[in-house]
UniProtKB/Swiss-Prot annotation:
One record GO biological process: one-carbon metabolic process
Primary localization class, coarse: cytoplasm
Domain of life: Bacteria
Organism: Rhodopirellula baltica (strain DSM 10527 / NCIMB 13988 / SH1)
Protein name per Swiss-Prot or TrEMBL: Formylmethanofuran--tetrahydromethanopterin formyltransferase
A GO molecular function held by the record: formylmethanofuran-tetrahydromethanopterin N-formyltransferase activity
Recorded name of the encoding gene: ffsA
Transmembrane segments: none
Lineage: Bacteria, Pseudomonadati, Planctomycetota, Planctomycetia, Pirellulales
Amino acid sequence: MADPAATPKSLSIACVSIKDTFAEAFDMKATRLIVTADDRRWCDESARAMCGFGTSVIACGLEIAVEQTLSPEQTPDGRPGVAILAFGMSGKDLEKQIPRRAGQCVLTCPTTALYGGIPGGREVHPKRVPIGKSLRYFGDGNQISKQIQHLDADGRSRPVRYWRIPVMDGEFVCQHDVGRVDAIGGGNFILVGRTMQSVTIASRAAIDAMRELPGIITPFPGGTTRSGSKVGSKYAALFASTNDSFCPTLREVTPSELPSEANAAIEVVIDGLSFDEIAESMRVGITAACEAGASEGLLSVSAGNYGGKLGRHHFKLHELLADASSASDSGAER
């Protein structure tokens, strides 16, 4: 008689199969920035430029995207703002890349200002990421600084230095430096469907639902990527190449993770400030994808991993989604 414990458990949400696998994620460093401006359009234009070409550390230096839109009541200077999360493989990557993007995309944009925005209660690394410390020299000796006392999350007062750099619309105000924290990159899930339309509908529903969550970004175009990768390549110069097990055109020539009726797959990749924030975003995103995609031909949800060899953070789909599956099943029974 078969051991029930050895039999893989089936799990589904809205009749979409959830594979018994895990997403493998790895350690990163992150910072959170707040861009403000006189109006929403300038703010969004600056953020769009700063986050451009920021999908993957493989070629972009950083993984960076807008985390949240902020009302004037949520920003340091009472103006419209956005919060941006940036992730690098090391603190040095942040120290190199952030001043470049700030100088080219925020300093240049009319009326903007730039501040640090790491949420309270996080353990901040003592070595900080330069902003005004680097950009002040653009003022050619006319820049001035001022220290203002701020209260930390624990109630302690500490001085924060700001720079005022003269520019053609007045002054560019920015913080001297900003904090960085330990973070996680590479949380993910893969949506498998009968058609491209089915995974498009599902992925957009997932991203729309996840957009409201703090502490995470989905840095690829529209929050998704079709070019999921595996570690290694037949070409020595590449350390990553196409994830052939999810490519429908390679089903006959390589071991495939796709069922015979599947013709498309899309991956959602998530970077976050903590394990719990990524886990919650995966729960929310996958649930929304299944509910929106089930009637459109979404077949299953899987995840990308490397056998545990790349990252120490493992997001097991069945553990994350057990409650969502139970709620879905009870809803279907009613």
